[in-house]
């Protein structure tokens, strides 16, 4: 079974078993040399909006903002994504929906992310679409994910993306 080497334990093999080590094979990850692949397209998604920008000084202390337990648990689950790219490599379409949705979900579920939620959701999804294939719901990504990120985050991201497109289009018309 194909898996990330960080999730592979030698105790799972018997003496004489053959082990094949090769780089992730995905259109979004061109091989640079030997076992190294260029994973910079994942960085482009984060650069497109995978952060919260807040002017310091006037902002309230983040620890004083109440977060409902369910939202905190879901955000924590999404934040568990380590950005390894196993989801992209496992997908027959080389899609990065699970990675992107984990980043969108992590920020979008917290009160601190609400101010910029629609702009970075749109930017991150569009950056993802520039570098990776489209999701056709095979679910291989979630199966390969070492952090067991749920496919539910893809639905969350798709919903937020549609809301963002509608909202941002409405705002663009209000000049």
Please annotate each region the language model reported:
Residues 1-25:
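Hydrophobic/aromatic-rich structural module bridging two neighboring secondary-structure elements via a short loop
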Residues 21-27, 31-175:
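Ferredoxin-type iron-sulfur electron-transfer modules in oxidoreductases and energy-metabolism complexes
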């Amino acid at each position: 079974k194909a898996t990330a080497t960080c999730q592979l334990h030698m105790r799972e093999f018997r003496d004489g078993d053959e082990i094949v080590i090769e780089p992730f094979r995905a259109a979004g990850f061109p091989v640079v040399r030997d076992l190294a692949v260029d994973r910079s397209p994942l960085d482009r998604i984060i650069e497109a909006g995978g952060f919260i920008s807040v002017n310091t000084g006037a902002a309230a202390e983040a620890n004083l903002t109440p977060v409902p337990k369910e939202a905190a648990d879901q955000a924590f689950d999404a934040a568990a994504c380590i950005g390894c790219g196993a989801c992209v490599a496992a997908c027959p379409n080389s899609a990065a929906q699970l990675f992107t949705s984990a980043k969108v979900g992590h920020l979008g579920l917290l009160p601190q992310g609400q101010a910029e939620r629609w702009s970075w959701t749109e930017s991150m999804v569009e950056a993802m679409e520039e570098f990776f294939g489209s999701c056709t719901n095979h679910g291989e990504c979630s199966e390969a994910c070492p952090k067991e990120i749920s496919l539910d985050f893809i639905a969350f991201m798709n919903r937020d993306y549609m809301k963002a497109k509608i909202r941002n289009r409405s705002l663009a018309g209000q000049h």
